[in-house]
């Protein structure tokens, strides 16, 4: 039996205020910069083919990136899924901070290398994050959409790609370290599009 492949575009949001060193408090409310809004408009040109489904995370910067594509394809179904960024530091601990000011907290988190550790309110553990990634892959597998455009975030997209390489890998400290190395060595540019093909069993 021939397996029908589904095309998925994993699109990182365009330039945000956090990306250029702006002070932020709520991870969900970080907006795009003026440059990021222009980049979002330019993304539309990549869509030669009409998508079957447009998906975005609930975070503002992803929704703003998706908006020009939604404007072009007004009749295409749009949904918001749990494909938001991995927030592993509690927002309460980094209110009104810049990326450099958060770096000691970030370094401490990865050095701990405990997949079950949760930093506090508004944060999630690495294990829970990977559960969310697997949940999104399951949704993509189950939806009747030949071409799905997913507007998401660098850590989430990297996790999807990493998980697809070895779906049965246990989520332990070794896996967490491997993921971190992948993230550090292969950063995704703002506005980048990564295409994956999923078969009928989600691989």
Locate the predicted segments by residue.
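Acidic, low-complexity terminal tails and accessory targeting/binding regions
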Residues: 2-6, 75, 86-100, 162-203
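Active-site-proximal alpha-helix that buttresses catalytic centers in soluble enzyme cores
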Residues: 2-78
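Short, active-site-adjacent cap segments at secondary-structure transitions
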Residues: 17, 61-63, 86-87, 156-158
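Phosphate-handling substructures
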Residues: 31, 71-135, 184
């Amino acid at each position: 039996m021939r397996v029908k492949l589904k095309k998925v575009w994993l699109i990182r949001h365009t330039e945000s205020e956090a990306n250029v060193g702006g002070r932020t408090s709520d991870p969900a409310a970080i907006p795009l910069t003026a440059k990021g809004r222009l980049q979002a408009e330019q993304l539309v040109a990549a869509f030669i083919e009409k998508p079957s489904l447009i998906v975005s995370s609930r975070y503002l910067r992803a929704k703003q990136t998706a908006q020009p594509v939604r404007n072009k394809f007004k009749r295409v179904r749009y949904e918001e899924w749990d494909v938001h960024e991995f927030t592993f530091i509690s927002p309460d601990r980094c209110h009104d901070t810049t990326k450099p000011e958060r770096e000691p907290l970030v370094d401490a988190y990865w050095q701990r290398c405990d997949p079950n550790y949760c930093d506090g309110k508004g944060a999630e553990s690495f294990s829970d994050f990977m559960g969310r990634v697997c949940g999104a892959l399951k949704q993509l597998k189950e939806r009747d959409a030949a071409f799905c455009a997913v507007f998401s975030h660098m850590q989430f997209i990297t996790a999807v790609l990493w998980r697809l390489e070895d779906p049965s890998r246990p989520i332990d400290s070794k896996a967490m370290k491997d993921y971190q190395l992948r993230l550090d060595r292969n950063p995704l540019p703002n506005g980048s599009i990564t295409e994956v093909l999923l078969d009928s069993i989600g691989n």
